């Protein structure tokens, strides 16, 4: 098994998508990329901890590669806008890849260049070494699956899950 740590806006969105990927064993929402140990959601939302909302993904590389995970990652969020995804604004929503090895770093650098060419814009995704992951509070876990009728889920998360299912049908482990 391998681990990937990615932030692409609200972790409810990224968790909902990556939970549906074949080869993904677990997805945990949390905080990473900052300097404050054991931050709370409220602290992260102040923009003072330096942390981003991220997901930590444990995956089977014989089923899904790190490169394929990054392809999904870049397709389900906007990697060209700093500190924002849609109406979610703040540094905690920034696009960030926290690499766990030099191989992951190399692949991420290649994917950033690929998406800059593909999108015709500068990709602002931060690429930094993984240091620590702080798991989010329980109420953030499986948020989408527990609250599908919540307006945010219908308006923001549903389109991302549907886009993943449409663009990566061979990578989907379950339907909506």
Swiss-Prot record:
GO MF annotation, one: peptide-methionine (S)-S-oxide reductase activity
Alphabetized UniProt keyword annotations: Oxidoreductase
Enzyme nomenclature, EC number: 1.8.4.11
Active site, UniProt feature: 10
Record-level GO BP terms: protein modification process
PANTHER family membership: PEPTIDE METHIONINE SULFOXIDE REDUCTASE, PEPTIDE METHIONINE SULFOXIDE REDUCTASE MSRA 2
Protein function: Has an important function as a repair enzyme for proteins that have been inactivated by oxidation. Catalyzes the reversible oxidation-reduction of methionine sulfoxide in proteins to methionine.
Protein name: Peptide methionine sulfoxide reductase MsrA
Top-level taxonomy: Archaea, Thermoproteota, Thermoprotei, Sulfolobales, Sulfolobaceae
